[in-house]
Amino acid sequence: MIRIFYQGAIQMSRTEEVELTNMCMLCDGKGNVLVQNKKNHPTWHGWNFPGGHVEKGEYVTPSVIREMKEETGLTIENPKLCGIKEFHKTEDGKRYIVFLYVANRFSGELKSSAEGDVFWYPLSELQQSTELIDGFEEMLPVFTSDGISEVYYTQDGDTVFC
């Protein structure tokens, strides 16, 4: 516990509940990226990149390799962390962090899962798609730009890129 003195004593905790997830932009080397059409999620419908939760005790990079295998049938190699997305969930105030990866080496046979159908789509056309999950287009620059490594949403509803 740290105390910060600013117009009186305020107590702040260094710990908070955090939900850790991952997402990966997999490139095929021909200008296409692997897209997932989430259709079975109760509130998140549309296109995004595959990914999921980091399980308790699991390291972050192995979690994205596992999630990609589970959701696409492909085994990715050497995924590179390209940034993060974070926000506080309004329901419970819990911090939600998404570790964003890019990979271009993979093996296996592409197959869809219960999470949704997966398919290759031209990266150059993705930003303009009307099928994207709400807010996904705001994350794309973190995957594609060397100058942006984080996107977060303030509790006032602002989107900030770093």
What are these regions (language model features)?
Residues 75-83:
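A short coil-to-beta-strand element that immediately follows conserved catalytic motifs
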